[in-house]
From Swiss-Prot:
Protein name: Prefoldin subunit 6
Modified residues (N6-acetyllysine): K21, K66
Cross-link (Glycyl lysine isopeptide (Lys-Gly) (interchain with G-Cter in SUMO1)): K66
Alphabetical keyword list: Acetylation, Chaperone, Isopeptide bond, Ubl conjugation
Key word Chaperone present: yes
Subunit organization: Heterohexamer of two PFD-alpha type and four PFD-beta type subunits. Component of the PAQosome complex which is responsible for the biogenesis of several protein complexes and which consists of R2TP complex members RUVBL1, RUVBL2, RPAP3 and PIH1D1, URI complex members PFDN2, PFDN6, PDRG1, UXT and URI1 as well as ASDURF, POLR2E and DNAAF10/WDR92.
N-terminal signal peptide: none
CDD domains per record: Prefoldin_6
Gene3D superfamilies: 1.10.287.370
Purpose: Binds specifically to cytosolic chaperonin (c-CPN) and transfers target proteins to it. Binds to nascent polypeptide chain and promotes folding in an environment in which there are many competing pathways for nonnative proteins.
Source organism: Bos taurus (Bovine)
Keyword Chaperone annotated: yes
Amino acid sequence: MAELIQKKLQGEVEKYQQLQKDLSKSMSGRQKLEAQLTENNIVKEELALLDGSNVVFKLLGPVLVKQELGEARATVGKRLDYITAEIKRYESQLRDLEQQSEQQRETLAQLQQEFQRAQAAKAGAPGKA
């Protein structure tokens, strides 16, 4: 009985560890998006300071290519919208993973109690080993 519970407990621990890895990956991804959001907001602010007489370039591979100011502003705006949507998606994913992780912790606690009871019963019943 105790061996069966121990195997089940081990499987649940592995699931919990995988959830923690997924949670860590999602947090890392969200942090990268936050950095991109900050960077793009700075670019948007800088583009807002320019007027039509200024020349704007964008980097395509190793080459700088002239770009219209309006087009550059639109591109940055679209990028900000995309990054914001991705951050919301990551936040939702993080909430789900945290909820799953909490449920997994509760399952682990129950299995640990069952295992301890089985161990105690095994120790309390001499000759059944």
